Amino acid sequence: MFRRLLIATVVGILAAFAVAGFRHAMLLLEWLFLNNDSGSLVNAATNLSPWRRLLTPALGGLAAGLLLMGWQKFTQQRPHAPTDYMEALQTDGQFDYAASLVKSLASLLVVTSGSAIGREGAMILLAALAASCFAQRFTPRQEWKLWIACGAAAGMAAAYRAPLAGSLFIAEVLFGTMMLASLGPVIISAVVALLVSNLINHSDALLYNVQLSVTVQARDYALIISTGVLAGLCGPLLLTLMNACHRGFVSLKLAPPCQLALGGLIVGLLSLFTPAVWGNGYSTVQSFLTAPPLLMIIAGIFLCKLCAVLASSGSGAPGGVFTPTLFIGLAIGMLYGRSLGLWFPDGEEITLLLGLTGMATLLAATTHAPIMSTLMICEMTGEYQLLPGLLIACVIASVISRTLHRDSIYRQHTAQHS
């Protein structure tokens, strides 16, 4: 057991450096090509001319598509192992290392050029990849899946600063595949990854800065639960839209470079209306949490961002969908909160409260992982007073969504982009 905990610590350290490496590569490319050193793609888009704002996501998609197509032709004659940690965990615990690195590089290109896709997906993949490399060299074959799971959880902890949520994501999503007894090493890896990531970044700040002064009362619990019901209905709708967009892009029968470029061009067109559509949505979420906008502004940005996410994901852009889902959930919750705020004196606090609730419940509705979703929002914001209400609402959202749509967003996205 001591040996496993020691290996889990090493895996956590490797995962933290893998995530940091991807993050610094992003910052370097943004500085080189966008002249942006703020770390915010929304700021980068704001400072670009309309033509560059329009074409940059398309060019990034084109470059990523050419890379993926070239690699596919180069390796046409050899057998392929999984390039995703979920696939590796469901098979024999082995990766196609070269293909996974190419996939991560393609993700780096589309993410830094403004596509509305999550950077965290590639970060988690690289963390799992680093864990797999170490495991295959120093551990017996029957443990390989455990260390990939530890790497994925550690990558999630380093990317989102949420070690418990990262650990429980692995447990909830892989329920039946991984024994609960294995959670010890997973948690150790996740916590170590967070600590090392904090040292690398010279910061232990929360992912999102929120000033929620409300004390949760009976009325608020009712609003939180009703938001869970709303998210439970919206989750399957989002999944259906994503699936329909993917089928639409596939039906065009375009070569991968053209398909990804088309997705990027749509994002570029939408960014002419609002630069907030660029990127995974992190900076927009933070700005909404700092000062919730008015109803019509939320609605406008929400519609543009939703279309950008659908275009990026549907075109096959390699990347994650968790963070874009967080923004969509925040916007749905805030739209609901703004509507209710007309009848309550503390409308601003209700909007913020239901925005956070929307983030958690839509994540639960799309991932079918209610405990992870609850803990993730609490860990990212530090608002642990919301935990009881969020847990109830997330379970309700997950049950409703699972009833209406069998597959989670992660399994659907993996099936489409693997």
Curated annotation (Swiss-Prot):
GO terms for molecular function: voltage-gated chloride channel activity. Keywords: Cell inner membrane, Cell membrane, Chloride, Chloride channel, Ion channel, Ion transport, Membrane, Transmembrane, Transmembrane helix, Transport, Voltage-gated channel. One of its GO terms (biological process) is response to acidic pH. GO terms for cellular component: chloride channel complex; plasma membrane. The chain crosses the membrane at residues 5-25, 54-74, 146-166, 168-188, 222-242, 260-280, 291-311, 316-336, 352-372, 380-400. Pfam families: Voltage_CLC (PF00654). It is a multi-pass membrane protein. It comes from the Bacteria. InterPro entries: Cl-channel_core (IPR014743), Cl-channel_volt-gated_ClcB (IPR023790), ClC (IPR001807), ClC-type_chloride_channel (IPR050368). It is found in: Cell inner membrane. Belongs to the chloride channel (TC 2.A.49) family. ClcB subfamily. PANTHER family: CHLORIDE CHANNEL PROTEIN CLC-E. Probably acts as an electrical shunt for an outwardly-directed proton pump that is linked to amino acid decarboxylation, as part of the extreme acid resistance (XAR) response. NCBIfam families: PRK01610.1 (NF002437). This is Voltage-gated ClC-type chloride channel ClcB. It comes from Escherichia coli O9:H4 (strain HS). The gene is clcB.
